[in-house]
Amino acid sequence: MPVTLHTPPAFDLTPTEIARWAAIPVAVAVDLGRDAGLIDPAIRPLRPAGQQPRLFGQAVTVRCEAPDFGAVLHALDVIQRGQVLMIDAAGHRDTAMIGDILSGHLRNKGIAGLVCDGAVRDTGTLGGWDDFLVFSRWITPRGPTGADRGAVNLPVVIGGCLVSPGDLVIGDDDGLVSLSPRIVRTRIADAEAKLFRESDWTSALASGKSAAEVFGLAPTIQP
């Protein structure tokens, strides 16, 4: 069956709506609760902790039927600068869906990075880039064996999270979150408020206030 290219929904978030999330860490976004699409933390960045720039951009999705990677190939001509390639390979661990050649092409196009719920290879190269970020569940040296099946720009499941084309994807050392356009619009004020509270807590603790005072803990009792 040939690769299916779906027409994506209009990516109708404004640059301003997207930009406000650029300062929000994944942990703060996830603290919003069920509205935030937490992606399985087992999908990890290739770069070491502390050296991982933020992954940030709207999703272009592919569903692969590993060991076939046809959908990834077709996505190369669809994805646009600043977007994130989200590869649903159903957690397949034995065959890489992408390596340095295709990732290098995406990098040259100005793509923000990729997330693979499956395997990647050539990680020495991929992990050395600080302007193209790669998250993957698995690493394997074995390459794909077909390019005839799959689909592009449809809802997929990445790490147990439903991800649709146009969702905002944020990644950092702690993991990944996917936010629907509705959540991007309606929960940014809550995320910014949480970030402000965390800054307030840090300042209060540094000033010498007790944890009980800062966090409003109930009085303790003596045994």
Language model: regions and residue ranges:
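Feature captures the catalytic cores and cofactor-binding loops of soluble hydro-lyases/lyases
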Residues: 1-165, 171, 179-223
